[in-house]
């Protein structure tokens, strides 16, 4: 559906520096500040001109799209993971590399905790890498509209176990996490170019539990 118009444009502050990163802030106009139409946008983007254009801006703009579409706060893994998925491959490869480091050094986050996180944890970087990888895995399994419908049900019901069962066929978040771990262990392959179809790939991974 078409996104609602904003009350005012979003001002963007640009700072050129070697490290690519950004920040976008806004408020919701609902009674508790967690729901409603977003407003009072502020965006800051940092990095080289190339990285700002191909990674930082797409990431920060994606935050505004998700806020405008769902009109509520999102779990941190979902918001940052989905927004990281639109970055340049040079940035997403860093996430994939960092993920392996985090998972092999005891910094991975259990899904039953991660899916409920509405605020950033003290150790933020694993959330970004793991969130990106989980979003990419789900997008490999089905279409973007399917993913959006999955998110909508999870937000409405607060039952992510039920949402992941309905939309992706996993028994619960634990089942998803074990299967995702197997996928990561196989190198996070693109399923559209895998030697077996998507319908064969996930059942094979689950049989390895």
Segments the model singles out, each with a brief description of its role:
Residues 53, 57-61, 78-82, 95, ...:
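Stable alpha-helical elements in mature extracytoplasmic
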Residues 69, 73-118, 167, 171-183:
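Post-HExxH zinc-binding segment in Zn-dependent metallohydrolases
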Residues 109-112, 122-126, 156-209:
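Beta/coil-rich, acidic/histidine-enriched accessory regions frequently appended to metallopeptidases
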Residues 1-2, 62-71, 87-92, 104, ...:
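Sec-exported extracytoplasmic/periplasmic mature domains
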Residues 1-75, 92, 108, 117, ...:
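Juxtacatalytic substrate-recognition/specificity segment
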Residues 24-27, 95-98, 150, 193-195:
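Short, solvent-exposed loop/turn and secondary-structure capping segments
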């Amino acid at each position: 559906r078409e996104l609602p118009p904003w009350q005012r444009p979003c001002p963007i502050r640009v700072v050129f520096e070697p490290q690519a990163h950004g920040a976008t802030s806004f408020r919701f106009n609902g009674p508790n500040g967690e729901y409603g139409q977003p407003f009072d946008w502020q965006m800051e983007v940092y990095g080289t001109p190339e990285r700002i254009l191909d990674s930082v801006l797409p990431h920060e703009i994606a935050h505004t799209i998700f806020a405008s579409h769902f009109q509520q706060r999102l779990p941190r893994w979902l918001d940052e993971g989905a927004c990281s998925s639109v970055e340049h491959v040079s940035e997403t490869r860093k996430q994939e590399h960092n993920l392996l480091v985090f998972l092999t050094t005891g910094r991975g986050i259990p899904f039953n905790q991660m899916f409920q996180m509405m605020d950033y944890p003290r150790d933020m970087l694993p959330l970004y890498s793991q969130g990106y990888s989980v979003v990419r895995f789900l997008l490999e399994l089905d279409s973007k509209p399917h993913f959006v419908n999955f998110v909508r049900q999870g937000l409405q019901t607060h039952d992510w176990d039920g949402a992941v069962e309905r939309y992706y066929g996993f028994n619960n978040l634990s089942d998803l996490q074990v299967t995702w771990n197997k996928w990561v262990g196989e190198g996070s392959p693109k399923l559209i170019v895998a030697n077996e179809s998507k319908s064969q790939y996930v059942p094979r991974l689950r049989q390895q539990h």
